[in-house]
Curated annotation (Swiss-Prot):
Subunit structure as annotated in this protein's UniProt entry: Part of the 30S ribosomal subunit. Contacts proteins S4 and S8.
InterPro entries from the UniProt entry: Ribosomal_Su5_D2-typ_SF (IPR020568), Ribosomal_uS5 (IPR000851), Ribosomal_uS5_bac-type (IPR005712), Ribosomal_uS5_C (IPR005324), Ribosomal_uS5_N (IPR013810), Ribosomal_uS5_N_CS (IPR018192), Ribsml_uS5_D2-typ_fold_subgr (IPR014721)
Entry GO MF terms: rRNA binding; structural constituent of ribosome
Function: With S4 and S12 plays an important role in translational accuracy. Located at the back of the 30S subunit body where it stabilizes the conformation of the head with respect to the body.
Protein name (database record): Small ribosomal subunit protein uS5
HAMAP family hit by this protein: Ribosomal_uS5_B (MF_01307_B)
GO cellular component: small ribosomal subunit
Any GO BP annotation: translation
Length: 147
């Protein structure tokens, strides 16, 4: 297992959710957090954490993200080729863009490609816009890239 210097990485919280368990005495709340970490130099990871308090869920998600770091192969400031990936009901399409285009991405796709260090890319999210599935589809697409 590789060890990364956490100071180099930035964290972005994509989603915080509240889940409820109804018990005899009322409702019990727990929180979930979806976090992306990246160093803007080709390393990016996604993590999911659950806890009774929001800060604990975020901390667990960050720890999980560092366990799931992947390397993204780039070609200059963009990606080498088109890639389309399906993850559950979410589909994501990534296309290389010419220099100066910028990151054209929406929702939870944008922080992933930015933290991966990609500066010029066109993306389209198709199907379900469930943030957890869109994030996982984007990570899957980035791992399929050939340098």
């Amino acid at each position: 297992m590789e060890k990364y210097n956490r100071e180099e990485f930035e964290e972005v919280i994509v989603d915080i959710g509240r889940v409820t368990k109804v018990v005899k005495g009322g409702r019990r709340f727990r929180f979930t957090a979806l976090v992306i970490v990246g160093n803007r130099k080709g390393l990016v990871g996604v993590g999911y954490g659950k806890a009774k308090e929001v800060p604990d869920a975020i901390r667990k998600a960050v720890d999980d993200a560092f366990k799931n770091i992947v390397e993204v192969k780039t070609k200059g400031s963009t990606i080498a080729h088109d890639v389309e990936v399906k993850y559950n009901a979410s589909r994501i399409l990534l296309k290389p863009a010419s220099e100066g285009t910028g990151v054209i991405a929406g929702g939870s796709t944008r922080p992933i490609v930015e933290l991966a260090g990609i500066k010029d890319i066109l993306t389209k999210s198709l199907g379900s816009n469930n943030s957890a599935n869109v994030v996982r589809a984007t990570i899957k697409a980035l791992t399929m890239l050939k340098g």
